[in-house]
Regions:
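A conserved regulatory-domain signal marking ACT and ACT-like small-molecule sensing domains
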Residues: 1-179
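NAD(P)-binding Rossmann-fold cofactor-contacting core
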Residues: 185-200
Length: 200
């Protein structure tokens, strides 16, 4: 069911939390309207299980604008502490696996999160599209490339992951090259060796 992997960098998360015991869902529509009127694109939305907090992903350059717009509209709620101060978490990236009917395939989301965890990549937030077409994870931008490689390796394994190698030169340079390849965990198939006196 997995058809591809996507990523988006330069992302910030706005953390919004209700402090009056009411579900954040009751004010979510108001927040979305504020951001829409401010021409701020919402990239991802995730809600905490206790339903009193909401995290919204926006582009880095729009994060402060979004925070100010929400604070302006909720000035009373913030003043009487019915809403906690809005926090911004910057320098994030969104990585996602894309496919069809993924909800009906057990273990897809868990597999994604396990891959990230096994590679020591911290997950800041997660979201699954209602259309069942994608599962997304928000991570630190510094881990974006590492995450994409790990996800691709896990979900798009090939039958033969080795490369053919014909090594010309068996001295220090050749030995160093083989050592570097070995340390990178790349599987190689040595097809031949040659130096200035012999070819095998």
């Amino acid at each position: 069911p997995i058809k591809g992997i996507s990523s988006l960098g330069s992302v910030s998360l706005l953390h919004i939390q209700s402090n009056n015991g009411k579900s954040i869902g009751e004010i979510a529509a108001r927040i979305f309207d504020i951001l829409s009127r401010s021409d701020i694109e919402i990239l991802l939305i995730t809600q905490a299980s206790h339903e009193q907090s909401l995290s919204i992903a926006v582009n880095n350059h729009q994060a402060q604008k979004a925070k100010i717009a929400i604070e302006k509209d909720f000035v009373l709620e913030l003043k009487v502490e019915q809403m906690l101060p809005i926090l911004i978490e910057e320098n994030l990236s969104i990585v996602a696996i894309v496919g069809r009917q993924m909800k009906g395939v057990p273990g897809i989301s868990g597999k994604l999160f396990s891959v990230l965890g096994n590679n020591k990549i911290n997950i800041v937030a997660i979201a699954q599209g209602s259309s069942e077409l994608n599962v997304s994870a928000v991570i630190n931008s510094k881990d974006e490339t590492k995450a994409l490689r790990a996800i691709h390796k896990e979900f798009f394994k090939t039958i033969d992951e080795s490369i053919n190698l014909f090594l010309v030169g068996t001295g220090l340079i050749g030995a160093t090259l083989l050592k570097q390849i070995n340390e990178s965990s790349i599987s190689i198939r040595l097809c031949g060796l040659a130096n200035d006196q012999l070819m095998l």
